[in-house]
Swiss-Prot record:
Keywords: Ribonucleoprotein, Ribosomal protein, RNA-binding, rRNA-binding. Belongs to the universal ribosomal protein uS19 family. GO terms for cellular component: cytoplasm; small ribosomal subunit. It comes from Desulfotalea psychrophila (strain LSv54 / DSM 12343). This is Small ribosomal subunit protein uS19. PROSITE patterns: RIBOSOMAL_S19 (PS00323). GO terms for molecular function: rRNA binding; structural constituent of ribosome. The gene is rpsS. The keyword RNA-binding applies. GO terms for biological process: ribosomal small subunit assembly; translation.
Length: 91
């Protein structure tokens, strides 16, 4: 279920301040964040975020296709190793 249009997108205040500072200074430094719940706004296009996945920070370069999605969608938290192979030789 998506968020109500009248509420608008959610962006953590501390993350918004970091984005504003980065845009004012024109620096392309990586913005480190734990805020996986924040929406990606159009002003974030072209910036790189280091999004925490619970263990380490995953670099995420924001493109136009990502606008409207959450930052956490682009840093997976679970690793899938696949199912074990069939053990036909053991029969």
């Amino acid at each position: 279920m998506s968020r109500s249009i009248k509420k608008g997108p959610f962006i953590d205040d501390h993350l918004q301040k970091k984005v504003d500072q980065s845009l004012e200074s024109g620096s392309r430094k990586v913005i480190k964040t734990w805020s996986r719940r924040s929406d990606i706004s159009p002003e974030m296009v072209g910036l790189t975020f280091a999004v925490h996945n619970g263990k380490k920070f995953i670099p995420v370069f924001v493109s136009e296709n990502m606008v409207g999605h959450k930052l956490g969608e682009f840093s997976p938290t679970r690793t899938y190793y696949g199912h074990s192979a069939d053990k036909k030789g053991k029969r």
